[in-house]
Amino acid sequence: MNPMNEVQISKATVSIGVGEAGEKLSRAITLLEQMFDQTPVKTFSKVTNPEFGIRKRQPIACKLTLRGEKADKAIEMVLEGINKNIKPTQFDAQGNLSFGIKEHIDIPGMKYNPDIGIFGMNVSVTFEKPGYRIAKRRIQQKKVPAKHRISKEETMKYMEDNFNVNYVTE
């Protein structure tokens, strides 16, 4: 196979949406730091929503972006939390994968800590092929050609080969 056509992981993003600022958000930040040995960033609300008690630019969630070897280890770890079962509908047309974990204690090695509590999280994995830099660079920025874009099937095969995932239909 041509090495320029090999699918690789660009990044893995893990986020916890708390919905409020304060103690609960700081506990979610502590949890992500403990799980991935990296400091997460806070994300802020974009609009005011009085029904939920949210004001504009109020911190309501935290997220973490992992790249390289850290991303591979993190994906392997969180896939164990869902027993490596993925639905084909969790892949989008560009070949990205997104799934949720209901409780972080489902992940092997994670223990319940009463000081932190239980949090669910969203995991998004972005894939790319070598040469995707042309779309991100500053000078002479171009689109990735259609024949070089990643399809859903390519990503599904990559996950099956490298992470031994099972595809469930439900």
Curated annotation (Swiss-Prot):
Lineage of the organism: Archaea, Methanobacteriati, Methanobacteriota, Methanomada group, Methanobacteria
Complex and partners: Part of the 50S ribosomal subunit; contacts the 5S rRNA and probably tRNA. Forms a bridge to the 30S subunit in the 70S ribosome.
GO cellular component: ribonucleoprotein complex; ribosome
Family: Belongs to the universal ribosomal protein uL5 family.
Keywords: Ribonucleoprotein, Ribosomal protein, RNA-binding, rRNA-binding, tRNA-binding
Record-level Gene Ontology MF annotations: rRNA binding; structural constituent of ribosome; tRNA binding
Gene name of the encoded protein: rpl5
NCBIfam families: PRK04219.1
Function recorded in the entry: This is one of the proteins that bind and probably mediate the attachment of the 5S RNA into the large ribosomal subunit, where it forms part of the central protuberance. In the 70S ribosome it contacts protein S13 of the 30S subunit (bridge B1b), connecting the 2 subunits; this bridge is implicated in subunit movement. May contact the P site tRNA; the 5S rRNA and some of its associated proteins might help stabilize positioning of ribosome-bound tRNAs.
GO biological process: translation
Domain of life: Archaea
Gene3D superfamilies on file: 3.30.1440.10
SUPFAM superfamilies assigned to the protein according to its UniProt record, in alphabetical order: RL5-like (SSF55282)
Record-given protein name: Large ribosomal subunit protein uL5
